[in-house]
């Protein structure tokens, strides 16, 4: 996983974005370790489910249940809460 901190203008509507094994983090993220832990879950999801299949399933889930009830986001939020201390200093 490669983490790159980007300026706010490049990511004005969120704190993090994962594209396979690349994680973009907004420099203004309030809790960067949480955001990195959250996005690390998405890296794992991309890896386990597949490069083409994961984005398809993620978008399908997003349309069906919205962002807050998306199973992939729920899993990432839980992992972020439980493991954020492991990502301090990144």
Label every model-predicted segment:
Residues 1-9:
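Juxtamembrane/interface helices at transmembrane-helix boundaries
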Residues 1-2, 79-90:
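Charged phosphate-binding loop/patch that engages nucleotide di/tri-phosphates or the phosphate backbone
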Residues 8-22, 46-78, 89-90:
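Post-HEXXH active-site segment of zinc metalloproteases
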Residues 41, 45-48, 81-84:
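Generic short alpha-helical segment signal, independent of protein family or function
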Residues 29-44:
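Short alpha-helix carrying the canonical HExxH Zn2+-binding catalytic motif
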Residues 2, 22-26:
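Membrane-proximal topogenic or attachment-prone low-complexity segments at protein termini
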């Amino acid at each position: 996983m490669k983490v790159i901190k980007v300026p706010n203008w490049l990511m004005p509507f969120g704190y993090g974005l994962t594209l396979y094994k690349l994680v973009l983090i907004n420099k203004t993220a309030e809790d960067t370790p949480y955001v990195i832990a959250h996005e690390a879950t998405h890296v794992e999801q991309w890896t386990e489910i597949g490069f083409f299949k994961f984005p398809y399933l993620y978008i399908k889930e997003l349309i069906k249940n919205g962002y807050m009830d998306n199973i992939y986001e729920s899993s990432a939020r839980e992992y972020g809460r439980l493991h954020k201390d492991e990502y301090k200093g990144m």
